[in-house]
Amino acid sequence: MRPKRYFCDPSLAAALLGATPERLLGDMQTLGMLFENLVPRDVRVFLSTYGGVDNSVHYFRDEKDLEVDLIVEHDGRWGAIEVKLSETKAGDGARNLKALERKVLSNPAAQNAAPAFLAVVVGKGSIAYTRDDGVAVIPMAALGA
């Protein structure tokens, strides 16, 4: 796993950019970058409410550029999350997640556990569902209280 830096609050970056809602809706690249900073922040907040030690969130990229936005570890278990602004990109995220799962489980000597979950968090989506490959697709709004 390699370190990746995130804004503590992506609204700070939006303010520095002078990004109004109207401007962001016209600039999907910047909106996507801000969204990819928002989800890790919120996942860290959610995870902080769980008891126990060893709760952590990491970014993963290997030497072949397989990349997964978030690896969540809690209580000896792990899961992986890809972040996509649009639900239409959920398939891309699911492919990365399944590739990571295959990589982790392909070394029998390591005796790695299977992931507790694989999920794509999307900014624009109507409902949460599980794809045929077992990857959950979850709209960000569904994660709120």
Locations of regions flagged by a protein language model:
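A cross-kingdom feature that marks ATP-driven nucleic-acid transaction machinery
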Residues: 1-145
